[in-house]
């Protein structure tokens, strides 16, 4: 999985079950066993954990480290996924699923996104489909969405690969879960990219920050 810094601690705590003690100890600047990551901010760091699913099976989750440069992690996630497919799972595309979480402005504005999508179906780079989750808060830092792109939707970049795009109201939790289930089923059956555009809002105090 790859994502930017916003919401990262939430994902680490509630999806990856990284303990609050581990998270808050990083605020204290505690020393790491590996000095290569010393001094990096806590919402740049990666994490790996094994989670038990409702059916009793276990799944290994990995969140890749990511700098403040939005979308820079995208090709890294794809590369890790392809390497695991080739070297660990004997080319089985169903064994591992790359998930990328985007912001609406970064998805439309960062060139690396288009580059990664263009490689999605190439023999030397394909990973059996990526699940793109787009958190659309309708603003890119201080840029209104009207001034952020020429296309109607930020997910129009997915038209390059004729990928399906599911639009869902981010305030409707049940609908979001249902959409995610459909997206995963599509990916596992057709091994193609799929996009989920979750429309949310951002509060005024947060926007000013």
Protein language model features and the residues they cover:
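Conserved internal helical-beta-strand scaffold that buttresses enzyme catalytic cores
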Residues: 1-112, 117-131, 136, 140-146, ...
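Hydrophobic/aromatic ligand-binding patch that stacks against planar heteroaromatic rings
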Residues: 122, 157, 186
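C-terminal catalytic or substrate-handling cores of phosphate/nucleotide-
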Residues: 77, 180-186
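Single conserved hydrophobic/aromatic residue that forms the stacking wall/gate
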Residues: 200-209
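Conserved thiamine diphosphate
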Residues: 54-55, 60, 153-179
């Amino acid at each position: 999985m790859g994502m930017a810094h916003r919401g990262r601690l939430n994902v680490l705590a509630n999806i990856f079950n990284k303990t609050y003690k581990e998270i808050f100890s990083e605020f204290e600047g505690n020393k790491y066993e590996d000095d290569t990551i010393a001094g990096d901010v806590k919402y740049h760091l990666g994490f790996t954990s094994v989670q038990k699913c409702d059916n009793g099976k276990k799944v290994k989750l990995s969140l890749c480290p990511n700098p403040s440069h939005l979308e820079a992690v995208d090709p890294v996630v794809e590369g890790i996924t392809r390497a695991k497919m080739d070297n660990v799972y004997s080319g089985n595309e169903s064994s591992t699923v790359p998930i990328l979480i985007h912001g609406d402005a970064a998805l439309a504005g960062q060139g690396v996104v288009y580059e990664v999508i263009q490689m999605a179906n190439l023999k030397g780079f394909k990973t059996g489909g990526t699940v793109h989750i787009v958190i659309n808060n309708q603003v890119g830092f201080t840029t209104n969405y009207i001034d952020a792109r020429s296309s109607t939707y930020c997910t129009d970049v997915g038209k390059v690969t004729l990928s399906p795009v599911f639009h869902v109201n981010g305030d409707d939790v049940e609908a979001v879960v249902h959409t995610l289930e459909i997206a995963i089923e599509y990916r596992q059956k057709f091994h193609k990219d799929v996009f989920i555009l979750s429309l949310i809002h951002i509060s005024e105090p947060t926007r000013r920050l």
